[in-house]
């Protein structure tokens, strides 16, 4: 990570689900110069991909005004959905992957598309669990939130609507 551009916000995110689906959580870290902010939240029943998406959404959604952002994640699902245009294609096709298959997590993809449109975002993929400090911190936050007591976790309403 190069901190040579003082006008760039560096965002990091990760998601986790135990059992997949099962209890889950996301973790996110924002860095702007010397300022660091962390976010996490646990959910009673969700999937790892929903939490990966929500980590990115939470990081980008916390930013005020239009920002230049480099978002680093170990989720190829998140990166490919945006960078390969999958999410926009699914959106244009009423959230269908093809004639027969619905796209998964349309609510989260819509939210991610919306927050990306508010900023100038570039994505960087890193391999998880390789000692990258911010990715490791996001992993700790996500897993901590997934393992938190159920009284600290919230319900993933859309997941429950879609999956009963």
Model-found features: residue ranges?
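Short, glycine/acidic-enriched capping/hinge loops at junctions between secondary-structure elements
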Residues: 22-24, 39-40
């Amino acid at each position: 990570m190069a901190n040579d551009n003082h006008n760039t916000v560096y965002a990091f995110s990760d998601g986790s689900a135990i059992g997949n689906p099962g209890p889950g959580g996301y973790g996110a870290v924002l860095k702007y110069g010397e300022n660091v902010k962390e976010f996490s939240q646990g959910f009673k029943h969700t999937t790892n991909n929903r939490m990966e998406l929500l980590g990115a959404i939470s990081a980008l959604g916390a930013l005020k005004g239009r920002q230049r952002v480099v978002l680093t994640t170990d989720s190829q699902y998140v990166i490919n959905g945006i960078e390969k245009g999958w999410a926009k294609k699914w959106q244009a096709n009423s959230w269908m992957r093809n004639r027969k298959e619905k796209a998964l997590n349309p609510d989260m993809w819509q939210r991610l598309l919306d927050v990306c449109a508010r900023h100038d975002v570039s994505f960087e993929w890193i391999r998880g669990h390789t000692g990258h400090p911010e990715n490791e911190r996001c992993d700790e936050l996500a897993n901590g939130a997934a393992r938190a007591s159920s009284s600290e976790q919230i319900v993933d309403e859309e997941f429950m609507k879609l999956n009963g």
